[in-house]
Amino acid sequence: MTSLLVAQEVGYHRDGQDILRGVTFAAAAGELVGLIGPNGAGKSTLLKVISGLWPGATGTIRLLDRPLSAYSPRDAARVVAQVPQITALDFPFTVRQVVMMGRNPHLGRFELESERDRGIAERAMRRTQTLDLADRLIGTLSGGERQRVLIARALTQEPRLLLLDEPTANLDLQHQIGIMALIGDLIRGEGLGAVAAVHDLELAARFCDRVVLLARGAVLAEGAPADVLTPDHLRAAYGVRAQAYPDPLTGHLRLSVLDGA
């Protein structure tokens, strides 16, 4: 698989603290890499650093084998699209208008959207099952619908890599599974790569091809979910005694927390 993203020895210092320390991992086309770890481990910070939103990191970040520093913000937005955590989104824009914002990196300052741009946005809405919501105001949608719209906006950028910050936060179980399944389908169907901060370990184990376990800003373990979610790693990262095991009905990894460390 072709590496879309390579991060080597990435560090980030902010407000007197080392938030990231020597983080190394890669993401390839056709795979979903999950960033897991306790609150404060550095997952969201790592996504912001990779995207270029938070400059000043040490180490090396390469996108499509070019240093991140070689990209202008506009050029980077043509390669990497971000899907933030769901916000209120109560501004008076329709779904179609929000999705069309994904074309901004491809347009000049005073350039209007073309028929091709509108076609790209419509295809993204169709892929995310939001086309029937196109004329609704974004603030009237449910959490799951809003998340699909944000993914459609990201697809409209025509990126190579998606960065998703807890895409299932504040969603019920049905929508959590639906969003993660959608991300997986898009990655394989569109040939994209994706890096997602995932809070729920069972969701990460079920849908991610690989996971990167962060603890105190450093990589504690990286690899297939079954290889990373070991009792020793879980104790070191989360401070609990826990055991991952395959569900006898589905084969998906489940997690049992036995007690505190």
Regions found by a protein language model. Give the residues of each.
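Conserved ABC ATPase signature
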Residues: 137-141, 145
